[in-house]
Amino acid sequence: MSERLALYARLVRIDKPIGTLLLLWPTLWALWMAAGGPPALSVFCIFFAGTFLMRSAGCAINDYADRDFDKHVKRTKERPLTAGKIAAWEAVLIAAVLALIAFALILPLNSLTKWLAVVAAVVAGTYPFFKRFFAIPQAYLGIAFGFGIPMAFAAVQDQVPLVAWVMLLANVFWAVAYDTAYAMVDRDDDLLIGIKTSAITFGRFDVAAIMLCYAAFLVLMGWAGVMLSLGWPYWVGLAAAAVCAGYHYTLIRDRDRMRCFAAFRHNNWLGACVFAGTAVAYAIR
């Protein structure tokens, strides 16, 4: 039994929290901005737990969708489903159960949040299949990973103002930046098996495209800060995020696999910088 649970834990990437963190940071930015400071504890706990559950569900359904591709990729061929250690139906069941628990968490929230949660679930569930035909599936991932933003505003304000959509667009650019670096790790394998990624689509302009996406992210988050009249700590946080992006350039410019993966993981700190600036800006108001 314990061995089975360990396989399920690997399926949902409990040992690899970076995906959860990249999903969590934009949600926390939005919660603080929507509430004008720390949100209600109940709302915070719902979104915190929901982030973990939905990322876990997304990993399970992603492995189900990619089970025939992952066996040809060095980094993924030993995943439990790909290696035949768990069945496809188990992955689907786990994803469904986790998604249902996540939806149950938001039942105390308003109807707008619930409807947005349905849209978010559809986007998250369909993302793995976009790699078959969409040239830049990372943009769709950005919508999936950023949908906590409009949901947070809906939960706190019972509306989704323009600033939420600006932040969602910013998150799309951020996701394209960090996930292109991630896709550069697997590019050779992905070319062989026919999966589409932004790293393949951008080709020799991959590094330039990543840096342009970081720039677009910073500009849009700056616009959000202006719209919300955020104080100097927010801009310090955004400047620190820009420094992180510059550091990522030094990691990816030579396209070394391990350094590209390090750049992807380091985006956790970029997200943390934006959150720290946001939290302090509201704390000293």
Swiss-Prot record:
Keyword annotations from UniProtKB, A to Z: Cell inner membrane, Cell membrane, Magnesium, Membrane, Transferase, Transmembrane, Transmembrane helix, Ubiquinone biosynthesis
Matching Gene3D superfamilies: UbiA prenyltransferase
Enzyme class at the top of the EC tree: transferase
Bilayer topology: Multi-pass membrane protein
Primary residence: membrane
Keyword Cell membrane attached: yes
Gene Ontology MF term list: 4-hydroxybenzoate polyprenyltransferase activity
The protein's Enzyme Commission number: 2.5.1.39
Sections of the chain in a coiled coil: none
GO biological process, one term: ubiquinone biosynthetic process
Record carries keyword Hydrolase: no
Cellular localisation: Cell inner membrane
Gene Ontology annotations for the cellular component aspect, listed alphabetically: plasma membrane
Pfam family, one: UbiA
Cofactor: Mg(2+)
Pathway involvement of the protein, from the record: Cofactor biosynthesis; ubiquinone biosynthesis
InterPro entries: HB_polyprenyltransferase-like (IPR006370), Prenyltransferase (IPR039653), UbiA_prenyltransferase (IPR000537), UbiA_prenylTrfase_CS (IPR030470), UbiA_sf (IPR044878)
Entry-linked PROSITE patterns: UBIA
Transmembrane segments: 28-48, 86-106, 110-130, 133-153, 160-180, 207-227, 232-252, 262-284
Function: Catalyzes the prenylation of para-hydroxybenzoate (PHB) with an all-trans polyprenyl group. Mediates the second step in the final reaction sequence of ubiquinone-8 (UQ-8) biosynthesis, which is the condensation of the polyisoprenoid side chain with PHB, generating the first membrane-bound Q intermediate 3-octaprenyl-4-hydroxybenzoate.
Family: Belongs to the UbiA prenyltransferase family.
NCBIfam families: ubiA_proteo (TIGR01474)
Name this protein carries in UniProt: 4-hydroxybenzoate octaprenyltransferase
